[in-house]
Amino acid sequence: MKKVSIYNKLHFLVLPIACCLFIASCKQIDVYEKNTVIPNYEWSSSFTASGNFVIKDTVSAYSIYLVLRHTDAYKYNNIWLNIGLQPPGDSLIKQKVDLQLGDDVNGWEGTGMNDIWEVRKLLNGQPRRFKQAGNYNFSISQIMRDNPLTNIMSVGIRVEKRNP
């Protein structure tokens, strides 16, 4: 008769428990992100990036990020944007945003690879709660003097549900 060591018995017990704990520890983060590619990296003032996201939980707070990707050849340290948010069944709320992309001393903000830079900035400085559940529409347009504004690759919104 073959002897089964205590280690073999533990192996068959520990492995399934470890797998269950690993699977249970994986928590899905509620995230929405939509980025719109700017055609030919030339953002005309008439071109508006837009999209929509659904809010189901009105108790939790959400972080809303503006995501912008540009090349190293972009000639300004900032970009002025008109950001619109339309709650379900309500009118459009517009906000002008001066998004700082860098400065002359420290260079570009965000993450970069070769000559491409991505900046992700929290809008309004803190997470917010949505008053009503439903479909929210957003729009982003550039309001700089240059038309078209060159070397902007994409722009979008990222919405993350914060942990309570």
Positions of PLM-derived features:
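Post-signal peptide N-terminal segment of mature Sec-exported envelope proteins
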Residues: 34-54
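C-terminal motif of bacterial Sec signal peptides marking the signal peptidase cleavage site
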Residues: 22-25
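Bacterial N-terminal signal peptides that target proteins for export
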Residues: 2-14
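Short coil-to-beta strand junction motifs in C2/discoidin
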Residues: 75-81, 151-154
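An anionic, turn-rich surface loop/hairpin at beta-sheet edges
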Residues: 96-129
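Bacterial signal peptide processing site
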Residues: 27-30
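Internal, hydrophobic beta-strand segments that form the core of beta-sheet-rich folds
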Residues: 131-147, 151-161
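Short amphipathic, basic-aromatic surface patches that mediate peripheral association
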Residues: 66-74
